[in-house]
Amino acid sequence: MTDPLVRLEQITVAFDDRPVVDRVNLTVSRGDIVTIIGPNGAGKTTLIKTVLGIQRATSGQLSVAPGLVIGYVPQHLTLEPTLPLSVRRFMLLSGRTLADCTAALERTGVAHLLDASVHHLSGGEKQRLLLARALARKPDLLVLDEPAQGVDINGQATLYDLIRQLRDELHCGIIMISHDLHLVMAATDRVICLNQHVCCSGYPEDISQDPAFVETFGHQVAESLAVYHHHHNHRHNLHGDVVSSADAHEGCSHDHH
């Protein structure tokens, strides 16, 4: 197994002595697509901020690979509507060369919009622009916060497929937050169900049947997700380590009521 890009060990983030993220373990290596799901207020964004180094952990240990380059795609692109801003200018503000910016736009399929106004882009085009800006950094790790936000249903599957292709081409690791549970199950290698703590973690089709997942999201959601099937020759425990099938799930000791 390759050395991890990022490893979180027993990470806790508390505000006013109340844990928002509680003893979370997470390991991401090159080639991994790890999707974090959970209800609103589950601590997903706080966990991502910790990975990015924006939020300091109250306890636990965060380890990153030497020289790690992270490309971050935020959930929203909020700009002053009266500020004239072209795609070209927006990309160059990242500090990358025009050649790197253009190459990144080509990878995400929006190079033809180089001279367009950012304000006139559709939701899907904005997400591809944000993804291109992250790619221009030539990242080892991509962190995507709700990448399908504002994208119509017809474009969501295409966007997730692009993310998979980028993983294969760049051999980078990917951490993704998503509420689009149906598409997540078809687009990821490993799912972490977060509700302050890790409720369950592992192979997507197993997660949909895990009692902790069912309790968090309900039987109807779990049953609808079970139609997705992936075929892997390994499984992971809650720490992200490869284990035998019999040891794949450690369960959840937290009270979900």
From Swiss-Prot:
One of its GO terms (molecular function) is ATP binding. ATP binds at residues 38-45. It catalyses: Zn(2+)(out) + ATP(in) + H2O(in) = Zn(2+)(in) + ADP(in) + phosphate(in) + H(+)(in). It is a peripheral membrane protein. Residues 6-221 form the ABC transporter domain. SUPFAM superfamilies: P-loop containing nucleoside triphosphate hydrolases. GO terms for cellular component: plasma membrane. Its EC number is 7.2.2.20. Keywords: ATP-binding, Cell inner membrane, Cell membrane, Ion transport, Membrane, Nucleotide-binding, Translocase, Transport, Zinc, Zinc transport. GO terms for biological process: response to zinc ion. It is found in: Cell inner membrane. InterPro entries: AAA+_ATPase, ABC_transporter-like_ATP-bd, ABC_transporter-like_CS, Metal_Ion_Import_ABC, P-loop_NTPase. It is an enzyme of class 7 (translocase). Its main location: membrane. NCBIfam families: PRK09544.1. Belongs to the ABC transporter superfamily. Zinc importer (TC 3.A.1.15.5) family. Part of the ABC transporter complex ZnuABC involved in zinc import. Responsible for energy coupling to the transport system. The complex is composed of two ATP-binding proteins (ZnuC), two transmembrane proteins (ZnuB) and a solute-binding protein (ZnuA). This is Zinc import ATP-binding protein ZnuC. The gene is znuC.
